[in-house]
Amino acid sequence: MIDLIGSKIKVLGHSDPSLIGREGIILFETKKTFLIQTQNKIIRVLKSNGIFEIYSENRKVILPGSKLVGRIEKRWL
């Protein structure tokens, strides 16, 4: 299990074009969303609609949001 809270994240692709390129720190996550602190504000982003670059535990991974949907405790990367 990998806890992504506190990890850096960047939105590489999303069904909402206004989110592409946004980056920040993951503050919280639910089964379907990330709560991200950007420079200016806190945004909620649907996982299933995006492609994300995540820096966690000294490594960078690029993942489709569909791989991140679900309960945190059941996720293995």
Curated annotation (Swiss-Prot):
Source species, domain of life: Archaea
InterPro entries, per database record: RNase_P/MRP_Rpp29_sf, RNP1, Rof/RNase_P-like, Rpp29/RNP1
Location of the protein in the cell: Cytoplasm
Keywords linked to the UniProt accession: Cytoplasm, Endonuclease, Hydrolase, Nuclease, tRNA processing
GO CC annotations, alphabetized: cytoplasm; ribonuclease P complex
Family: Belongs to the eukaryotic/archaeal RNase P protein component 1 family.
Function comment: Part of ribonuclease P, a protein complex that generates mature tRNA molecules by cleaving their 5'-ends.
The name this protein goes by in its record: Ribonuclease P protein component 1
Natural source organism: Sulfurisphaera tokodaii (strain DSM 16993 / JCM 10545 / NBRC 100140 / 7)
